[in-house]
Regions:
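Beta-strand-enriched cores of mature, soluble protein domains
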Residues: 30-189
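Secretory targeting and sorting signals
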Residues: 1-30
Length: 189
């Protein structure tokens, strides 16, 4: 479980960085010159499989739909998400700052029959328009981010534990997945 836990810890720590990326991109819907506020949904999603999901710094390409149809990416790794922290994403359209509005909620599961381990972290955010710049200046709105990771531990091939899950071993590449999903109700000015 040590190697799986290390990968899961890295993904959990990435929550703070991921939150910024997922909440930030919807603000691209506004040029910052709109006469009146525009409010709408933005869904941001991305998934990687295999070696890319198990990398020390997992990079997930993101597709954005809703107010803005564009692409981006997020790198999992770094400081973790904590309630009250501000996270800033720098983009060509400006900087978007979000605040982690509640303590992130994490769940883990492990199936001893299949050796499958899963980790999910849910993070509630709110856009901080006063600390955002460019197209994001003055933006507001609530959002939710989910980071998901799943992998299979190898099995012992010999010895007294033969056939059992080797939770200290490197997770198997086949079937490994890391994903991001975010939904933001964004109001731009």
């Amino acid at each position: 479980m040590l190697k799986l836990k290390g990968t899961i810890r890295a993904l959990a720590a990435a929550g703070g960085i991921a939150v910024v990326t997922l909440a930030a991109v919807p603000a691209l819907a506004s040029s910052g010159h709109a006469a009146k506020p525009t409010t709408g949904p933005e869904v941001i999603s991305g998934t990687v499989h295999g070696k890319k999901a198990l990398a020390n710094k997992t990079i997930i390409p993101l597709k954005l739909t809703g107010l803005v149809a564009t692409r981006s990416s997020v790198t999992l790794g770094g400081s973790g998400a904590q309630k009250g922290n501000n996270k800033t994403l720098k983009t060509a359209a400006g900087n978007l700052t979000v605040k982690i509005a509640a303590k992130p909620q994490s769940t883990q599961s492990f199936n001893r029959k299949t050796c499958r381990e899963a980790f999910t972290q849910d993070i509630v955010v709110s856009v901080v328009g006063g600390r955002s710049t460019g197209a994001f200046a003055g933006a507001s709105g609530p959002g939710a981010v989910q980071i998901f990771f799943r992998a299979t531990a190898p099995r012992f091939t010999s010895g007294p534990h033969k056939g059992q899950c080797d939770t200290n071993g490197q997770p198997r590449v086949k079937g490994a997945v890391a994903s991001f999903l975010a939904s933001v109700v964004l109001t731009t000015r």
